[in-house]
Amino acid sequence: MNHEKTNDGNNRPSYKESLNLLKTSFSMRANAIVREPELQQFWKEKGIDFELGLANKGSTFTLHDGPPYANGNLHMGHALNKILKDIINKYQILKGSKVRFVPGWDCHGLPIELQVLKTLDRKEREDLTPIKLRKKAAAYAHKQIALQKDGFRRWGIWADWDNPYLTLQKEYEAAQIKLFGEMAFKGYIYRGLKPVHWSPSSRTALAEAELEYPEGHTSPSIYVAFSVVKLPNLLQESLSKQGLALPVHEDGLSNKLKVAIWTTTPWTLPANMAVAVNENIDYIIAKDNSEKLLIIASDLREIVSEEIGSPLEKVAIVKGKMLDGVLYKHPLFDSLNPFVLGGNYITTESGTGIVHTAPGHGVDDFNTGMKYKLPIICPVDEKGFFTSEAGDFEGLNVLKDANTKIINALKESGCLLKEKPYIHKYPYDWRTKKPTIFRATEQWFASVEGFRNDALNSIEKVEWLPQSGKKRIKSMVEDRGDWCISRQRNWGVPIPVFYSKEGSKVLLNEATIKHIYNLFVKYGADAWWELPISELLPSNYSSEAHKWEKGKDTMDVWFDSGSSWTSVISKSDELNYPADLYLEGSDQHRGWFQSSLLTSVAVNSHAPYLKVLTHGFALDENGRKMSKSLGNIIDPWKIINGGNNKKLEPAYGADVLRLWVSSVDYSVDVPIGNNILSQLSDVYRKVRNTARYLLGNLHDFDPAKDGLDIGDLPILDRWMLNRTADVVDEISIAFERYEFSKFFQLLQSFCVVDLSNFYLDIAKDRLYVSAPNDFRRRSCQYVLSLIVERLAGVISPVLSHTAEDIWQNIPYKLNEESVFQRYWPKVPDSWRDSSFNKPINQIRELRTSVNRALEDCRTRQELGSSLEASVRISPINESLQNSLTFLQENGHNSVDNLFDWLIVSKVQIGGEPWAEVLFTKEDDIGVIEIAKSRGAKCERCWHYELDIGQYERHPLLCGRCVDIIERID
């Protein structure tokens, strides 16, 4: 071998070519913008993505995809959700499970209608028919789905992208109609007048899941006094016994005795039909400073007194049940209304303890009204304006000018006690961002009461992760009312009913449902708008077509998505019903988890899932919700592709985005931002560089011919394989438990602490300096080959592209083209030997202490490389002494040397203290002395040895390197 001369003028030979330097095509930089799409194309061409899961022979695993809405760009919430699902699916595929992940999209509803309307000019809007709107909405949804699908694929998500489920598909809509019919025939679907959350801005009823409750809404808060006109005899007797004699005549009583109520919705007073009290609460009759008497809850006397600005003196006290049957005069109209007994919703936490009851404008009010057969009055139209039933207030908007006019009328009549602004949370339409009201309308409902107990029992049988999810959904199902499933929109699945043109008869039976189901299988829901009634009706009804008109309501979109179990997973032999797992954001306890539960329980008496896993929301680095107004939106597209300024917004690639998902405790809200991405990029770089180092040292190694028996390996290598086995086990457990942040921590620790900082640091001399075929090098290479294959395997569910890139850069022949074809890493029993752990952990602690001492010398510029040092160790710790003895007696003489492990030129155990030392340290381990190494520096291995200059052909080398050079030559 020719040893070239250096260029420094000293005429010294260079031994660089005699070293085993790194060689690999696995680049230091990921170049993810180019490389990741190449790897995705490789998966596609080789049928390695979701097709791998379909080909597996193991048991079926079904993670049922909750459908994102087909509108708008993908955001960090999408990334968190879909990547979590992909990690789980890929792990299951690697375990050999049969996996077919069917992605879905929620396609109906108002937001898409609004997007379509935005694109139309005035003339187009005027000419817009329901079917024209539906065609445009479907086209818009398909376009959005295509864009979102491309984004999901770029993230490395494996799914049956060519066969997704869409809630607008014919077969999906047909299955939904069938489900509706099954619920109807079990008696769970009914039509009735009932207060529902109504959005005047979108003119439709809303489900609870379609509401949001922003802070800072201001309502007019008023205290009002209604005049009492009649008392039951028993109440009069009770008051008389307490010394309170009241006028018997109506006029005299009404001038003297009032009942005080408090409300933040003055506009509901025209619909007042009663006041409700709690039969178990103590109520007082209190005298104000004008000698008027007020009925209020005893516990609220001081608060009411302060609010109305008048001292209130207790005159008499009665239980709430005594007030049942009292009559009062309506404050705005000439009518008499009763006191009634309400439920536990009446408390003494606020107000007066007496509730103004308008059955047409509240659920509790409605239920109480039904109990007492009160009129259900709702004098408000779909746009939020008073109708003629509101008398002089007709035409006023209940959310704008009605409150002011009503308050003025109360002032004029002398009924107003107090008015002031009240800031509180108030239900808003989540789409239009405008306030809603309670409004009684004719709607279609699913009677949750009919199967509530079954639903609660089903909740108990599901595994909820985190466990708090169980309590959350259980309380929601316990407390919820019947589910209003009708909407007054055109873009949706119709409620398949017919109404008689004369009278109030509704046509809904098995024959009509079966016929409409068959039509929808063939034509989709558009048939409801495109076909005449004669064709929508079964043949035996077609002659009566002129007597019927079809319904105009569509189904709540939560009924759409909540039907996915019947439309998707229960219809495929490749999927499980109930699904093994549902995984969505924590807001879905009131959304998809619940709607799916209710429909499945109603029809099949069990939940559609065995396990439910929830995640939090993606926030900015300061814990704030992302919004355009705050300018804090983190765009996943920019994370992958970079911004305009690549220095400020680098192109990190999909794997860094995926690494972020694995790094967070997703059970709570999770932060993301530039600083976090920068830190994650550093972690990713360390993992990548570790893999590159492993690959770079395998360029001339083939385990088929260079492999060794595990039992013949040095102690250091045996320990490293045992540690690798432990890490594979721990990562496996983390994936089984969906604890991906533990995977992240384990991966980081393994690559940085176990490999880079310890094993590979020690291995540099073995790998670079040894002769290519030396045992000390081949044994290390064998271990590196075993590790790199396992490393690629365990990171593949998360760092999918990087794992594949590693696999394709392994220089020796593998049986599998893809890391995913190897399946989940297996660890032979021969790797496992925990007897090495204690002594090596002790020596690692010693190494840490020595490194600190060496660093102290470097800081004082007394040392450069650690190989310039010699170390004397005088252990006082018996455990350490035993570990050093174990190494000396059992270690391989070419590898397991303490000076190699400490990366110094000489180590002395015990003996007399050295005369000349750079540093002395004494701690629990014992005494550590650092001295300058004697001898000269070998120009090849950089060790300091006493024999430098003794070899004529290589005067600058130590004896070990001379031997290696001569063997290479």
Curated annotation (Swiss-Prot):
A motif ('HIGH' region) lies at residues 68-78. It comes from the Bacteria. Keywords: Aminoacyl-tRNA synthetase, ATP-binding, Cytoplasm, Ligase, Metal-binding, Nucleotide-binding, Protein biosynthesis, Zinc. It is found in: Cytoplasm. Binds 1 zinc ion per subunit. The keyword Transmembrane does not apply. GO terms for molecular function: aminoacyl-tRNA deacylase activity; ATP binding; isoleucine-tRNA ligase activity; tRNA binding; zinc ion binding. The keyword Flavoprotein does not apply. GO terms for cellular component: cytoplasm. It holds the Pfam family tRNA-synt_1. It catalyses: tRNA(Ile) + L-isoleucine + ATP = L-isoleucyl-tRNA(Ile) + AMP + diphosphate. Zn(2+) binds at residues 938, 941, 958, 961. ATP binds at residue 628. L-isoleucyl-5'-AMP binds at residue 584. Monomer. IleRS has two distinct active sites: one for aminoacylation and one for editing. The misactivated valine is translocated from the active site to the editing site, which sterically excludes the correctly activated isoleucine. The single editing site contains two valyl binding pockets, one specific for each substrate (Val-AMP or Val-tRNA(Ile)). This is Isoleucine--tRNA ligase. The gene is ileS.
